[in-house]
Amino acid sequence: MRKIAIAGNWKMHKTQAEALEFLQTFLPLLQDTPEDRDVILCAPFTTLTALSKNLHGSRVQVGAQNIHWEDTGAFTGEISGPMLLETGVRYVVVGHSERRQFFGETDATVNQRLKAAQNHRLTPILCVGESKAQRDANETETVIFEQLEKGLVGVDQKNLIIAYEPIWAIGTGDTCASSEANRVIGLIRSRLTNHDVTIQYGGSVKPDNVDEIMAQPEIDGALVGGASLAGDGFARVVNYQ
């Protein structure tokens, strides 16, 4: 059975103090949130321990935004699975388009990170999606299928979330039409061996469009960027109708 998962991706936002201030607004607004919705905050490394401590016993889980495939080593600036486990996280974003675009992430390194996450009992959120140029060239399916084929080698699809994030819709205010997002996510599902994998939509998800997005039958959740930074706004997304 497919699970619903709403995840906020804070990216490089929020100090520890700002993260805890967010919780004061956010948590009281979840009292009536349906129990079948997993709520996840994917936060900067420096806030993970504080968030985990303050969310203990709540319905909100904590996620990281990256993981290295080695447990230790000379990898300046990276973070490993054992380090993440120590902070109390349960999820980790892997292969976000910003990592692919700005930090040289490839399908091969994405695959290594996915397997590292699973080896440490973390649930990875694999991001896939096409650029504007690729969509205009009718290459959406080709690009995404290649990302899936190369990224999922040796990956356990029973411990996995996938987020479809059309790159042209991330942080731009442009949202993929909900019907088109539903179509692409259906295609993604058709390429999986486990058809019960939770597949999210990401890309300018906001309080004023989340209801329409989540009404689509193939969409199991959302990976939310800018709209996850304000407690009241993200609560509205989590509490979609």
From Swiss-Prot:
<feature type="active site" description="Proton acceptor">
    <location>
        <position position="165"/>
    </location>
</feature>
<dbReference type="GO" id="GO:0004807">
    <property type="term" value="F:triose-phosphate isomerase activity"/>
</dbReference>
<comment type="function">
    <text>Involved in the gluconeogenesis. Catalyzes stereospecifically the conversion of dihydroxyacetone phosphate (DHAP) to D-glyceraldehyde-3-phosphate (G3P).</text>
</comment>
<keyword id="KW-0312">Gluconeogenesis</keyword>
<dbReference type="InterPro" id="IPR022896">
    <property type="entry name" value="TrioseP_Isoase_bac/euk"/>
</dbReference>
<feature type="binding site">
    <location>
        <begin position="225"/>
        <end position="226"/>
    </location>
    <ligand>
        <name>substrate</name>
    </ligand>
</feature>
<dbReference type="GO" id="GO:0005829">
    <property type="term" value="C:cytosol"/>
</dbReference>
<dbReference type="GO" id="GO:0006094">
    <property type="term" value="P:gluconeogenesis"/>
</dbReference>
<dbReference type="InterPro" id="IPR000652">
    <property type="entry name" value="Triosephosphate_isomerase"/>
</dbReference>
<dbReference type="InterPro" id="IPR013785">
    <property type="entry name" value="Aldolase_TIM"/>
</dbReference>
<protein>
    <recommendedName>
        <fullName>Triosephosphate isomerase</fullName>
        <ecNumber>5.3.1.1</ecNumber>
    </recommendedName>
</protein>
<feature type="active site" description="Electrophile">
    <location>
        <position position="96"/>
    </location>
</feature>
<feature type="binding site">
    <location>
        <position position="204"/>
    </location>
    <ligand>
        <name>substrate</name>
    </ligand>
</feature>
<dbReference type="GO" id="GO:0046166">
    <property type="term" value="P:glyceraldehyde-3-phosphate biosynthetic process"/>
</dbReference>
<feature type="binding site">
    <location>
        <begin position="9"/>
        <end position="11"/>
    </location>
    <ligand>
        <name>substrate</name>
    </ligand>
</feature>
<dbReference type="InterPro" id="IPR020861">
    <property type="entry name" value="Triosephosphate_isomerase_AS"/>
</dbReference>
<keyword id="KW-0324">Glycolysis</keyword>
<dbReference type="InterPro" id="IPR035990">
    <property type="entry name" value="TIM_sf"/>
</dbReference>
<keyword id="KW-0413">Isomerase</keyword>
<comment type="pathway">
    <text>Carbohydrate degradation; glycolysis; D-glyceraldehyde 3-phosphate from glycerone phosphate: step 1/1.</text>
</comment>
<dbReference type="Pfam" id="PF00121">
    <property type="entry name" value="TIM"/>
</dbReference>
<feature type="binding site">
    <location>
        <position position="171"/>
    </location>
    <ligand>
        <name>substrate</name>
    </ligand>
</feature>
<dbReference type="GO" id="GO:0006096">
    <property type="term" value="P:glycolytic process"/>
</dbReference>
<comment type="similarity">
    <text>Belongs to the triosephosphate isomerase family.</text>
</comment>
<keyword id="KW-0963">Cytoplasm</keyword>
<comment type="pathway">
    <text>Carbohydrate biosynthesis; gluconeogenesis.</text>
</comment>
<comment type="subunit">
    <text>Homodimer.</text>
</comment>
<dbReference type="GO" id="GO:0019563">
    <property type="term" value="P:glycerol catabolic process"/>
</dbReference>
